[in-house]
Amino acid sequence: MPFRSNNPLTRDELLSRFFPQFHPVTTFNSGLSGGSFLIEHQGQRFVVRQPHDPDAPQSAFLRQYRALSQLPACIAPKPHLYLRDWMVVDYLPGEVKTYLPDTNELAGLLYYLHQQPRFGWRITLLPLLELYWQQSDPARRTVGWLRRLKRLHKAREPRPLRLSPLHMDVHAGNLVHSASGLKLIDWEYAGDGDIALELAAVWVENTDQHRQLVNDYATRAKIYPAQLWRQVRRWFPWLLMLKAGWFEYRWRQTGDQQFIRLADDTWRQLLIKQ
């Protein structure tokens, strides 16, 4: 249920107006992040979410609601309410582990997602790369960063192998191991894009695990594994730049030192791979 309001509600106003019988579960935070919290009434649980990036346009949060509204409940939480700065979705019971599942199981989840109807908006990386450059700390903007940005601008994004709905933030912390199978949470970056971009973006432990994931996916998708791996590799420079830029952007936004460390590590990876 989308609900429009020009004035953002406080947490207490949200609960009293829309969920008067529910109460926050203050001792529970498994699988929750950012400003999310859990509410409960007679065994029914919802997750109340806020945008992770307070500076992102409201349209990005609305797109997340629309994506969840059309996805099957077997892979994503169903949304119940959207309004300015708030979204309420089903809580997915299960375990959030610190490591990825078996590659064949994960490949099955991603392949099933990629068979769903497209969301209706494309993921384009170049505008994000330029935004992160513009919004980063000027003292951190180097000639090398600008040179790589111009190189990607000239090259243009790889032509999609197959265009499908993507999650685009697949890592262990966004996977719920439920009794009915794997499910994905945190759909804030979802959109339509190349299946190889999704596979390239998975936060894997090492190259061997990555190759196995791609091979397992290729078997399901009836694509030659070598062809799919080549396409995945074409996206690597784009994704490394995306990660580095995002970490720089978040550093300036939050002042959190972990983002500087992550950015520096990603820049080192780019130097190794150039």
UniProtKB/Swiss-Prot annotation:
SUPFAM superfamilies reported in the protein's UniProt record: Protein kinase-like (PK-like)
Source taxon at top rank: Bacteria
InterPro entries: Aminoglycoside_PTrfase, Kinase-like_dom_sf, Thiamine_kinase
GO biological process assignments: thiamine diphosphate biosynthetic process; thiamine metabolic process
Transmembrane segments: none
Disulfide bonds: none
Chain's role: Catalyzes the ATP-dependent phosphorylation of thiamine to thiamine phosphate. Is involved in thiamine salvage.
Family recorded in the similarity comment: Belongs to the thiamine kinase family.
Protein name: Thiamine kinase
Organism: Escherichia coli (strain SMS-3-5 / SECEC)
